[in-house]
Amino acid sequence: MYTNIKLYLAAILCSIFFFSCAEEKDESNKSVQERILEAYLDLNYPGNKYMKTASGLIILSHQEGKGLTPVDGDGAYIRYSVKTLDGNYEKTTLENLAQQLGVYSATEYYGPELAEIGYGKISRGMHEALCMMREGGKMTIIIPPHLSSFDYNKNYYYGYDIDDTPQSSVNKIYEIELVHTIGDVFKFQTDSLERFRDIHYPGVDSTVTGYYFKKLSGTYKDTIPQNETASVWYVGKLLDGYVFDTNIADTAKKYGIYDASSSYTALSVSYESTFELMSSEGSESGNGYVTGFARALKSMTYGDHAVTFFWSKYGYGADGNVGDNGGGVPGYSMLFFDIYLDEKQY
């Protein structure tokens, strides 16, 4: 079927080329994409078996959910996949689909992503679709190029430096599932951390809102003084168990994230008088650690083994820490660290 689609769309493109050479480039692309979309819909959804909104968003299917509909100011955890009109997938947050497509990578996170509603940080087409959905629902849409841009007025108002030019020059199909609607992101994270604590570390108190720490073994003597150095081993995870970083070679191999070009050696940490000065925000060099990790280190001494878990404010924040290859930590991720300190070397 995809072969027929490609041939049909190719024919449309050829005819458009001969009759629209005199048009401006942006007008030409808009016209081309409109005709390609029309051809695709005529072939695959004859008889207008789809819905077109006033903005031009195409809704191919909609399975209604039973939960809350997100509104501006909410957060929405979504799973989604993106593909071109000829059926080639370009991105997916679904692990099983990535495996089927042969593009799965253990270094890439597969799970729901948080979309912020009403801040101009998602495309106009995605915003419109999510605001028509309810929690638990699924929708397949086509976002044309003019709806792939961000709402500049909103992201400028909220202080985000986001380009409002279209993010795509072609029509894209989005398969979306609205997993969870969140009115208050940090209340949701607080509740999630408490549930995680109750399951894995019952009885551990939060020493400060959004932060938990438990020493599993070692001494309870004074912490390491300023200007001393400790050798640190760690495993960094999300709360669902996804390992995003470690300096332990065997652990990296176990979770499929081993990189032969990386050096799996102990992290040499120079201690300061406060954990704030050891964090990336407080260190003079700007090369410190995320706040939650720095706070945990400051609570440990030589030979200790401890765990800590905390909300995204003490981690990588709203932007996350995503690498060029797509791996890393998504925005608004709660983090968990398993930390070991070597004994002091004299």
Where are the language model's segments positioned?
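Cross-family detector of peptidyl-prolyl cis-trans isomerase
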Residues: 21-346
